[in-house]
Amino acid sequence: MSELSVRSRRRIKIRGGHLGAFLCWAVVFADIGTSIYYVPGILYGNFQTRSAVFVLMTLFVFILLCIKYAEVTWRYPEGGGVVNVSSQALHPFAGLLGGTFILVDYYLTAAISALSGMIYLSVVAPGLTPWILVGTVASLLLLGVLNVLGIKESARTTAIFATAAAVGQVAVVLATAVYLGPTGILHSFSAVTRGPALSLPVMVMGYGAAFLAFSGLESIAQLAPAMREPRKSVSYRAMGAVVLTMVITSPLLTLWSTTLLSPNTDPQQFISVLGAHAAGQLLGDYVAISGSILLIFASNTAIIGAYHVFIALTRMGFLPRVLEHRNRWRLTPHWAILAAVWLPVVLIVVTRGQVGVLGDLYAFGLLGTFVLTCISLDLVRWREYKRWSPGVIAFFSVGVLTTLLVIIAWMINLYFKPDATKFGGGLTVIGLIAGLTTYRYYRNRRPAVFPVSFRPQRAKESIATALGSMRSGEHVLVILPHEQLAAEAVIAEAARAASGRGAVFLYRGVRHPHQHHELLEVGDPYLKDYAAVDAFSRAELLSRKLVPNRRYVYVPGNLPREMVAEVWRTVSPLETVVTDEDQGMLPPMAIDRIRRHTLEGTTVLHMYTSKVRAMPQSATA
C-alpha cells in the first residue's frame, strides 16, 4: 500500500473540551429552565386558563428543534451558534444578521431574567417589593462589574444551582399531583376548556406566543468548543435530558399554575405560590430562592453570550475593533461587556419593570435565530446528502417541516406583536448598518476574509462544497508561509501566475497547545489566529485586482501537516505556488516541472502537475 493511501486513511484525533452530557444539560437548563418562572404569568395575561394548550402545541416543535440544535453542535465544534452556521451555510453577511438576532434575544433574556429573579426573591423578602426596579438595575450593573473583573460562572457552579432549581420544579409537580390525587389530576385537564373561545386568531396568537416557554435552547450550540468528545453523542444525550426535563415540568406547571391558583395571585410568582399551595410555605420559599438564583445566573449567561457575539462579529470585520480590546488590569473585554449590559438596563427602566411588556418584545430575536439556524442546517444537509434513501428523505422532510413551523410562528409574531417587530427590527437594522459600514470601511485598509471551514472528518466535503466550480485544475493553489516577507513574495508570484484565472490561498495556523476557551466563547481557531487573519488580508489586498476568483482555506495549527496534503488532493490544482521550506507539506506527487523564482531572498516554487496522481511507493522510498 502506498504512503499516500496510509496517510489518507489515518484517523485524525480531535481533542474535545471537558463538559460531559450532565454539565451541558446544566448550562442549557440554567437558561431554558428559567422560562417556567415567568412564561405562565405572561401567557395568563392573554389566554387565561388556556395557556397550557399553547405550551403543548409548541412542545412538539421544541422537540424537533432540539434535534436540529444537537446536530448544529456536533457539526460546528467551534461553536458560535447561528452566527457560525449561517455564515458558513449561507454567507458571512447572514452571520451578521444572525448575530443581530441573537443579540436582541440576549438583551431581553438578561433584562427579563434579572427582573424575574428579583420578583421571586421578594417572595421570601417582601420588603424588596418596592425596590424591585432598583434592585434589577443594580443586579445588572453588578453582573457587568463582575464580568469586567473577570469573575465568571463555571459550568460546575451552574450545575449546582440548575440541579437545585430542577429539583424544586419537579417537587412542585409531584406535590401538586399528590395534592390533587388521580381524580383531581384528570379534572385539572378539563380546566383548559374554560376561558376565551379558541377561535382561529386566538389559536394562531397562542401558538406564536408560547415559544417563549422554550427560549434558551440556542445556548447548546455555544457550548460546542467546551464539549467533550465524541460531541455527537454528548450533544444528543444532553438535549435528550433537556427534553425530558422540559416535558415533565413546563406543560404541567403551566397548566396547574394558571388553573388552580386564585385570580388575585401575582402572575410573576406563580410557581412559588403553586408550591406553597400544594405542599406548604417551605416548598414555596425553596422554589423562590432556587428560582431567583437561577434567574440571576441566566441573566449573567446572557451577558456573557452577548459580549462573546460582539467579539466574534468584531473579529469577522463587522464591528469596530475597539470592542475586542481588553484592559491591562484584568484582561477582560470591557467595551464588549459594556455593550452587552447597557441596553438591558435601559429596557428595565423604560418598561418600568413590566415583565409582560418585556415578554412581548422577546419573540423577534428568539424566533429569528431559530429560523436562520433551521434554514442554514437544511441547506447543509441538502448539499451533503449523496444518497437519498427513504430514511434520509423522511429525516430531511422532518427538518424542513420544523423550519416551516418556526417560520409560521415568527410570521405570527411579526404581525400580532408590532412592538416586538419595531424593537427587534430596529435593533437589527442598526446592527446591519453598523456591520456593513464597518466592513466597507476596512475593505480598502485591512479587508475581512472568510476562509473555507476545514473539518478533518469531512475535509473533502467541506472544501468541495465551498469551492464549488473552482475545483477545476485551471486554478492555482497558493500555500502562504508564516513569515511576512516570504508571504508577500509568494503572493506576488501567485498573483502573476493566477492572473485572469483563480487562486486558492491556504494557510496553516500555529499550534497553541494551551489555548483556553471561555464558556460560551466562539472557539473558531481562525478568528483567534491573528497571523492568519493578517496573511489572508494581505493576500486579498494584493491579489484582488489581478485574480478574479479567490478562495481561502485555513487549516488549524493543532491538526497534522498531512491536512495540507488533503486540501491539495481536494483542490486538484495543476499549479502549486509554495516556498522551498514549505514544500514538505505537500503529498508525494508526479511533478512535470518546477520553476524557481527568488524574490528578496525567498525562493518560490511553481510546481506543475499535468495529472493529479500519487507517486508509487518505490518512487517515494
Residue ranges and their predicted role:
Residues 91, 238-300, 323-352:
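TM-loop-TM module centered on a large, flexible mid-protein loop between adjacent transmembrane helices
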Residues 1-39, 63, 67, 75-79, ...:
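Membrane-interface "cap" regions at the ends of multi-pass membrane proteins
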Residues 164-191, 254-261, 373-387, 414, ...:
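Hydrophobic alpha-helical segments and their helix-loop junctions in multi-pass secondary transporters
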Residues 10-11, 159-216, 222, 228, ...:
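Helix-loop-helix junctions that connect adjacent transmembrane segments
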Residues 132-182, 238-242, 359-372, 394-406, ...:
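Membrane-interface loop-to-helix entry segments
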Residues 472-526, 604-609:
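Small/aliphatic-rich secondary-structure junction motif
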Residues 157, 322-335, 370-418, 451-454:
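C-terminal membrane-solvent junction of multi-pass transporters and transport-like membrane proteins
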